[in-house]
Structures are given as structure tokens and as C-alpha cells.
A protein has these predicted regions:
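Aromatic- and glycine-enriched glycan-recognition loops and surfaces
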Residues: 302-395
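Active-site-adjacent "subsite" loops/lids of carbohydrate-active enzymes
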Residues: 377, 381-444, 522
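Carbohydrate-recognition beta-sandwich/jelly-roll modules
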Residues: 39-332, 367, 374
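Active-site-proximal substrate-binding groove within the catalytic cores of carbohydrate-active enzymes
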Residues: 244-245, 250, 439, 468-590
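The substrate-binding groove and active-site-proximal loops of carbohydrate-active enzymes
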Residues: 298-313, 345-358, 420-436, 459-469
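C-terminal segment of N-terminal export signals and the immediately downstream linker at the start
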Residues: 4-5, 24-38
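N-terminal secretory signal peptides and thylakoid transit peptides that target proteins
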Residues: 2-17
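Active-site groove signature of glycoside hydrolases
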Residues: 334-337, 438-466
Length: 590
């Protein structure tokens, strides 16, 4: 909570005492009394110093955070360029009443913890809304602006939920969440599919903080606990491919809702309008066969090491066995690592001779279609091996983060030498060279073999970068392929909010408190790493093994029943395969 002001601090904030010290050189507005005090807070105000639990990196001094109280909260700003961090200069701040709120103006900034001044202009607009406060801001400097953070106080301590997830108790830990894909630091921040933060209050209600943006742009939420409440940083990061000297923040909101569900429902109503999210029941990119799909089977092909779980003939034998137990037209076959060595062969996407070559693959598709089965091969939306001969022509699409540091897909130990490999470039679909290459490889599979869908791995991996918008890129890829191949379905691994407009089916997410709101727009099946019956092998996925529950069959209630097939599944675990198929038939009423 905001501490009470001493008389002297209140006088200073109102510009009544110490005016000579607070005012910048030149003319000063000496008109009406300030509409609200300016609180002389710093980065260490109202938080535990030192931290009492898990913590994140922070300044080791008192960075100025002059803030304005409004409707039970206080609001301050920080500005980040590509070379430093800036705070508002309290001596050059003023507060003015507006219709329904306040406007905070700053005609200068400080840096070096307040030891130095800088030019810059800031306007922060605070507005009352029925359940809290909405705000936006405009910031101008003489250099490109990287990010603008709102520093928010007045949110009480409590259990925390991120992105429409469930409440968890962090104790005295600091928290950091990033949208989307961890907000650019995948293994530092907790992920969130939409920029919504909720803190539980006594009596079952919650306090929420949410961005009302209408474009995919990085957001981060940092929560620092104090004795009574949280100091929250709500970070908006500017598009990395733009050199913006003047930035207008999209609206943010903080408020109180009767429940977690009430806050989530209001947020998803905004998303549906902002991103034109189609309803599942009427979306035009969902053919009838997909609506009738009752079982997804992931047929694992070749591991990174070259180990084959299922070659093309074995995949066909498995589908024949399944189609004898449920109608084949209710089965979608997801072909994982159909193209040889998993990820190593990216982005060639060519049939593998060890798995049977073109003749066996064509027979798999043709005879599978005769059974009614639909087919979906896997492609990496943003992965390319630098050692592949095609890479030099695509290198311009390799991703760097917003600060320019190269981003590789380097978080997997593919060969088990207990070290993460770094030969995979993380590619940007916003760059035409990569988008056209990948679209061409997908199109070739559709034209040559008549596959019914294509799967985009790491589809939700949007990263802010200096080159191009990844969301615009994936939208363009899907639109181009849809124009060339009407009726062929685009599917993704995981989603963020705006991606629900582009893709109708995913295989990660869709559950939790936000599940009903997400599933209004899309459907989900279970992940590639879902354990196969028996020992729980994850097939080509790097996890290795996880527990398969023979009682629940490891089926998620919110997802299309999914049966993962590895090397020993058909030979040794037909009883469990039968059980999964029976459960799928029961759910579908077959």
C-alpha cells in the first residue's frame, strides 16, 4: 500500500515547499493547485529489501519513481531506450484534473539514479472505469524508445494467476511473467498466452492488471512483494523493427472483479473483438471432417539420432488396426518426424529412404485415405539447421532479440551429451525468404500427396526482434497456403491470444480457468510429448519418458483424445490402445 506522506513530503509534492529546488530553469506554471500529490517514491519503496524469497535482478540503489495516487493505486513510469533506463523528473512533473481522471505531465527525465537529467516529454492519462482505472501514456525522446514500464502500487498480496491460469501461492517470491513466449526470455519469465494478471483478494474476488492492446507486442509483469502489497511493473515493449522516438502506450487497466472467472471473461471479450476471433462453430477454416474428428494419433517417425520408431509401412499397419476398431474418418494421423532425423533435417522436408521412401509414403497416404483417415505432417515454423545446404539462402531470416542478441533454438540436448545444442537458428516468418521457403515445402507435400492438414511446430513462439513481425508472418503464410489449397487445415503447437484468429487447432493448452473462453474459438489435442501407452515414451520428443496412467489413460478432459504411438505400442500395448479408442468413441458418441 502507499505509505502516508509526511507534511514536508506532501508540501514538496504539491509544489508549495522547496519550490526553487523542484522547479526546472525557465518559466513555471504557477496556476491552479495540483490535482493530486506527487509521491516521492523510489524503486525500494514498499518492498522487502533485501528480498525474502526467490528474486530477480534489480537496481542496487534507490531509483526515482515519483508516482501519483489515484483511486486507491499509485502510478509511475520508467522509460527504456536501447542504451539506458530513465525515470520521471519529479521537479518537472505536474498533475491536472481531466474529465473523469487525471493527467500527469513530465517535461524531463532523469537517469543515473536521479543524478543526471535528460530531455524528454511524458503524458500519463488516468481514467476512472466502473471497476478501477484505465491508463495510457505518450513518451517522446530524442532517441529510439525500447520499452515503457508503468510502476503500479496498491495491489494487495495474495495468490497470483497469470494469463487466465489458476491461482498459486508465491509466498515471498518475486514473480515475472512474459507475453507471449515468455516475453522474449523463455526460461526466465513464466509464460502467459494473454497479458492478464490476477491477484486473489479476501472474499473470493480478485484484483486484475491487463493490457488492452490490439496488436501482438511484448508485455511483462514483474511482482515485488512488500509488507502489505505488491509493487508491479507492467512493461510494454515497442516493436523491435521500428525506431520510435515517440511512443503511445496501448491502454492498460487495473481493477477489481467479483471472481477470477469474471475478470477472465471480461478480458476474453476484449480479445474476441480486438483480434476478430471467430467462433469455432462457424469459423470457415474448419472443414466438416475436423469437426467430426474423435481421435488424434501421433505416429512418431525418426528420432534426432536416427532411431526409427515407426517407418511408413508400420504407420500404415497401425492405422489399419485402429480403423478396424473405430471409423477411420474420425481419425486424424499426426505424422511427427516423417522427414527423417527430427529437427536435424529441418528445413529440407523430404521423404526419408530409411523410413520407406516415396513409394511407401504414398501408399501410407493413399491407403490411409481409403480407410477414411486424415493426415497431418509436421513442419517447424521457426527452426532451420545451419548445417543444411539450404540455410545460406535463408540466413537473413534468423532471429535476434530486441536488443540484437542472436536467438537460437538452443534449449534442447538432442544427443544427450548433457549440453544444449546450438546449431538450430530460430527463424522469423515475418521475413519473406523464410516464409516463402517454408510455404513452398508445405505446398509441395499437399500437391504431391494430398495431405489434409499441416502442423506448425512452435507456432506460438512470437519473439520481438529487429527485422519483422512474426505474427504478421504466420498470418501471411496461412493466408497464402489457404488461397493455394482451400480446405487444407493449418494447425499449431501452442497459441497466444491473437493466434486464435489464424489457427483453429492446437496441441498444447486449452485447459485451466480460461479454457472455456479459449475453446470458444479453437480446439486442442494432446502434445507430441504425451506419453505413449506402456513405459510412457515420448517418441521423437526430447523429454524421453513420462508416466502413462492406465486408469485415466492420460487423457485430458479438455482435449480431443490422443494416442501416441512409438516403437512398441502396437506390438505390446494393444489393450491400452483399445481402451483409448473406446474412450474416444464414448466421448464422440460413436
Amino acid at each position: 500500500m502507499v505509505p502516508p506522506l509526511s507534511r514536508r513530503d506532501a508540501l514538496k509534492a504539491l509544489g508549495i515547499a522547496g519550490a526553487a529546488a523542484l522547479q526546472p530553469p525557465g518559466p513555471v506554471d504557477t496556476g491552479a493547485r495540483a490535482a493530486a500529490p506527487i509521491l516521492p517514491l523510489t524503486s525500494t519503496s514498499d518492498v522487502h529489501v533485501p528480498p525474502r524469497g526467490r528474486s530477480f535482478l534489480k537496481f542496487s540503489f534507490d531509483h526515482p519513481e515519483p508516482s501519483v495516487p489515484f483511486e486507491g493505486f499509485s502510478f509511475g513510469l520508467m522509460v527504456f531506450t536501447r542504451e539506458n533506463a530513465y525515470g520521471l523528473d519529479q521537479a518537472r512533473m505536474s498533475v491536472h484534473e481531466t474529465d473523469g481522471g487525471l493527467e500527469v505531465r513530465a517535461t524531463g527525465l532523469v537517469w543515473a539514479g536521479g543524478q543526471q537529467r535528460a530531455d524528454g516529454e511524458v503524458r500519463l492519462a488516468l481514467r476512472r472505469i466502473p471497476d478501477g482505472v484505465e491508463w495510457d501514456a505518450t513518451v517522446a525522446m530524442d532517441r529510439p524508445i525500447k520499452a515503457v514500464t508503468t510502476v503500479l502500487r496498491g495491489v494487495p498480496r495474495g495468490r497470483v494467476a497469470a494469463g487466465g491460469g489458476a491461482f498459486t501461492d508465491p509466498g515471498d517470491d518475486e514473480l515475472l511473467f512474459g507475453y507471449p513466449f515468455g516475453g522474449g526470455d523463455l526460461f526466465v519469465a513464466g509464460g502467459m498466452n494473454t497479458p492478464l494478471l490476477q491477484v486473489e483478494e479476501a472474499g473470493g474476488g480478485c484484483c486484475y492488471v491487463a493490457s488492452r492492446d490490439t496488436a501482438v507486442r511484448t508485455k511483462r509483469f514483474y511482482l515485488q512483494p512488500g509488507g502489505q502489497g505488491y509493487r508491479i511493473e507492467a512493461v510494454h515493449e515497442v516493436e523491435g523493427w521500428k525506431d520510435e522516438h515517440r511512443v503511445t502506450l496501448p491502454p492498460w487497466r487495473v481493477g477489481r472483479a467479483a471472481s477470477l472467472e469474471a475478470a477472465t471473461a471480461a478480458h476474453y471479450a476484449h480479445l474476441a473483438q480486438a483480434y476478430r476471433l471467430p467462433d469455432w462453430d462457424t469459423r470457415p477454416d474448419v472443414p466438416d471432417w475436423l469437426r467430426r474428428t474423435a481421435l488424434v494419433t501421433t505416429l512418431h517417425g525418426m528420432h534426432y539420432t536416427g532411431y526409427i520408431f515407426n517407418d511408413y509401412p508400420k504407420m500404415l499397419a497401425t492405422l489399419r488396426w485402429m480403423a478396424a476398431r473405430m471409423p477411420g474418418e474420425r481419425i486424424l494421423a499426426f505424422l511427427a518426424a516423417w522427414d527423417g532425423r527430427y529437427y536435424w533435417n529441418y528445413p529440407a522436408y523430404e521423404l526419408d529412404p530409411r523410413m520407406g521412401g516415396e513409394r511407401a509414403f504414398r501408399r501410407l497416404i493413399d491407403e490411409g485415405h481409403d480407410l477414411g483417415v486424415r493426415f497431418m505432417p509436421m513442419f517447424g515454423a521457426n527452426a532451420a539447421n545451419r548445417h543444411q545446404p539450404s540455410f545460406p539462402a535463408l540466413a537473413e531470416a534468423a532471429t535476434a532479440k530486441v536488443d540484437g542478441d542472436t536467438m537460437d533454438l538452443n534449449w534442447v540436448d538432442w544427443d544427450n551429451d548433457r549440453h544444449m545444442e546450438g546449431w538450430l537458428a530460430y527463424m522469423n516468418l515475418g521475413v519473406a525468404a523464410w516464409r516463402e521457403w517454408l510455404g513452398g515445402r508445405i505446398s509441395a507435400m499437399i500437391e504431391r500427396f494430398g495431405v489434409d492438414a499441416y502442423f506448425l511446430d512452435i507456432a506460438g513462439g512470437w519473439v520481438n526482434n529487429p527485422r519483422a513481425d512474426m505474427h504478421a508472418g504466420i498470418r501471411q503464410l496461412v493466408q497464402d497456403l489457404r488461397a493455394r489449397h482451400p480446405g487444407v487445415v493449418a494447425v499449431g503447437e501452442m497459441h497466444y491470444d491473437a493466434l486464435l484468429e489464424v489457427l483453429p487447432l492446437f496441441h498444447a493448452g486449452g485447459g485451466g480457468p480460461a479454457g472455456p473462453h479459449v475453446q470458444r474459438h479453437a480446439r486442442f489435442f494432446q502434445h507430441l510429448s504425451h506419453p505413449a501407452p506402456g513405459r510412457g515414451s515420448t517418441g521423437v520428443h526430447e523429454e524421453g519418458f513420462s508416466r502413462f496412467d492406465p486408469d485415466t489413460l492420460s487423457l485430458a478432459p479438455h482435449a480431443i483424445p490422443t494416442l501416441n504411438v512409438v516403437d512398441d505400442t502396437l506390438a505390446r500395448h494393444q489393450d491400452l490402445m483399445d481402451a483409448v479408442i473406446r474412450r474416444a468413441r464414448e466421448r464422440a458418441g460413436i
